[in-house]
Amino acid sequence: MPRFDVYRNSGEYAEVTPYLLDVQSDLLHGLDTRVVVPLRRRDSFPVVGLPANLTPTFEVEGVECLMETPKLAAVPLRLLKSPIASIASKQFEITAALDFLFHGF
């Protein structure tokens, strides 16, 4: 499962958070979980003062989505079906958001 692949969210909140972004290192392929960050529809995100570098936006299937970095979680592999997109080209922004969450810079 390549890092930065995007999967459909089959969970309860899929209408407002339609996608999950895989942010786990490819070197950890033996685990039965993957660390993901929810990608929430930008138009359903409340207006709050979160730093833009913590919650960058990306377009997936024509939908503008906000990376909800503070809500990252591990999910079982069985919940992640076939990837629908890759946003590996946004690696810098994604990694910067994760660094900001964990290190504050």
Report each predicted region and the residues it spans.
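Secondary-structure boundary/capping motif
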Residues: 1-3, 95
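Compact nucleic-acid interaction/catalytic patches
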Residues: 3-6, 10, 14-56
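C-terminal terminal-subdomain/extension
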Residues: 58-105
